[in-house]
Amino acid sequence: MNQIKSNRELYLQYSASAPKLLAHVSKLLIFCRNSGISIPKGIRNIFEFTWEELINDPAVPTASEIQDLVVTFGTPTVVLAEVIPVQVLPMQKKQPPPAPPPTLMPAATSGGKYVPPTSTSAKLMPNGQNTLHKFQRQSIHLLTELLSLKMKAMVESASAGANPLDITKRFVEASQLLHLNAKEMAFDCLTGTVGKSCLSTAQLGKESSMNISAMGVNTPYQLVYQTSTACLSFSLCTGKESRKKDIGAKPKPVDDVSPQPVRARTPPENTVVELPDPCPEAREKLQDMCRHIEAERILWRGRNASCPMIFRNYRSRISSHLMLASKGDSHHPLTTGTQITASAPHQPSSQHAQMGRHSQEWKGPKKPIKLHYTFYDGSSFIYYPSGNIALLQIPTCCRGKPITCLFNDMPNTFLALFNAEGLGCVYYNLKNCCPYVLVLDEEGGITNDQKGYIVHRWSWASKTETLLSLEYKVNEQMKLTVLGQDSITVTFTSMNETVTISVSPKSCPHNVLHDKRPVRRISLMDEKVSKTNRALAEIKKRFQKTVTQFMNSVLLAAGLFTLEYPNPKETETSRVKLKPGSNQDRIRKTSLYQGENHMRIQSARQDSIINETLKEDSILTSLAHVQKKNGKVQVKVLPRGKRREVRSPTRWAASPSDCPLVLRRLILKEDIRAGCKCIVKAPLVSDLELERFLSAPRDPNQVLVFGIMSSQDPTLTAQLQWLMDTLYSHLQQGRSSPCIQCRHDPYRLLRYDLDSPLQKDPPLMVKKFAVIHGMVLMFAGGKLLFGGCVLNGYGFSKQNLLKQIFRAQQDCKMGYFLPDNYKFKHDAFKASRIAKPCGLSSRGVPSQFLGLETEPSMSTYVTNLDDTESTKKPPSDDYEGSVSSVALVDKIEKEPPPSPEKVKPPEIELQPFTKMRRSSKKTAGFKKLNSKK
């Protein structure tokens, strides 16, 4: 309590010495003007200093490596800890009383700009100075009484616990206790001096009329209480001041002007208001505005929002300085221009330029430029002179918890952010590697340089070394000042206007208290624990997914789990109504027979030297560094789980067309709830759903591999059946619904049975492509890519089948497809000699090699375009010999022997064939079978 009382006494002492200081400053200004010394307009009034700025002893700043940053560290003092939190808030409420002093001098010297420059104005300097000095003495006396009344009202309100907003109203009531004798004394002193100066010389009528209009007041002051801003203002002017328009006309006699103030002071004080109103229309409009503002204030008070509204524009103080300069220098026109150009003293001075600039600044902008606007809800806005927002402060839950944003003087440029919890960050206003220059939190703060290195670090709770002060120039107009965790301010200065906003963390009853806020403390151990928890969560998801897939596979194999498919009616309407010729619309450009055959022959010769020691199972994962004679070619086949899938822009959902069995049941209007059961063997495709299955939407780069089977004689296609089953089981391992889950695989394995009861007579494959048992067909996008009995130029094996699928994929990407009317021609080997005792003869060639011809070129397989003779021949003649090799040999023996010119030795004829088949493990078995036959 002793500290608080001493502060009040100190404040009373400052208030008592303020009028003397103001008088001294006024004399100094008069002396500077008379001497022709230009004074800047940005002199700060002593009453604008806050209590914190007056009592704090600024520490010595330390040099910082960051530009525009001044940081001071040291041991925290007791004054900062005890005095600032207690005295900052009460003293901020005591700032309104000193507001009137800045208006004394402009109001007292108003009207000076209307004096035309004359040569005789210099003679009035002594009289004008005496008048000004007497007026200042009376103003100081008035200011002293006002300050004493203000302090008395504040002490009474503080002791009684009244609302601080009612202090100003009490001040108005207390001001009425002033003696009327003091007012009359000031009036007599002022008017007496003016009268003497006016009657002394008859040639100075204009000057006397001007002085009378300014000094002829009925009372020394008139207090006006503004309810919108809760502020007081007083003026030393009367209603006669509105008649300044008559100054330029004829000067009125002194006798007509001087008696009016005398008549105004003789009646009682209550009759002064009865003077004629100079502008009733304007007064009515102002009264309407005041009533509207008061109604809004009452409305917001009901909403628990009692923040006063502030509408502050630029040049509000500049115009008052201009009024002061013009009035004080009415007798010296040359110094007027000097005062106007005080903000730019290095500019050349000229009378005409100065007077022109004076007139322009006096008129001011037609539309006021916004500076600082504050509304009832607590939101505050500060603007640049250009109109862009510099500072934005919006309350969250109440006025005490705002969010503050700082912006640069250009659109969409963010500088800083502060919230009510004490978190904040300040960005560099230029492009740097590290965007943050300052970061604040509950524990402390750090400052970073442009490269991101930490320059300073401090803690609010430190007892030995803490932050004493920090100043950072955010840009040319804004400066951030940090004196503690509870004292963070942003100062905006532009065009001699200064606005200070507090961004300190505050507490409110709607949220957690400031001292109970959770502190963010994340150590290295916590980071490790969080990483471990994330890894465990990922492992848990994988395990659950694997177990779910395994259970679905078991249930699906047991018939206890079925897949849900779309409504059969909707699927039937969208799929069954396809036109028969829709497959022809998907045809791309076809390749010529010569180019296709030449490419396949060359690829077969290059791959003939591939190392056969590679394991067959490793082909599914990768084929790398394949050696050739002239160089190394790297062939990479990624694993099934990591294949680079080339998908079309549209992704297909699960549909019945993915599984041939489900599609067949859908066409037959059977129940499809059983779902897909193609887990062990490749799905069997019949003629009933073949066209629709090929034309169904799927990945255009997916290769459909059809194996032509025979159910009546399984021994003819036993090797192909075993190869398809082995590869299919390895490909679909672990899948609960293979037909749906293989939509994005590079290839699919399918079966086509020529002897199935669901096939037509003849089957579609035989009718369209003239296929036989044991052949392999490959489709992509509904078009044929490959067909034959010999894979990759050698025969049937898993390695050769995968290589042939890879070639088909490359052909599909290049757009090489076989024509739609393409039919395969199957001729037996032409041999002229009888088989040798070893058993190797043309009759012993198995049915899998029925695509070969014994020409000198020894091509892998021969494909001819369908001619007119082949189309007339019935399809039964084409594949009748492929069913049994014995029937084929009998057919060959009945043919006439060839001519001697075409007959070749068997050594020359069979040498390339034996060389090519040397690496095949299946040749020995065929030789033994032929020898037995």
Curated annotation (Swiss-Prot):
InterPro entries named among the record's database cross-references:
FAM194_C (IPR029281)
Q: Name one Pfam family in it.
A: FAM194
- Subcellular localization(s) per the UniProt record: Membrane
In this chain, composition skew of type Polar residues spans 343-353
Q: What is the official name of this protein in its record?
A: Uncharacterized protein C3orf20 homolog
**To which species is this protein native?**
Mus musculus (Mouse)
What stretches pass through the bilayer? 771-791
This entry carries the following GO cellular component terms, namely:
cytoplasm; membrane
The primary location reported for this protein is: membrane
Q: Basic residues bias: where? A: 915-933
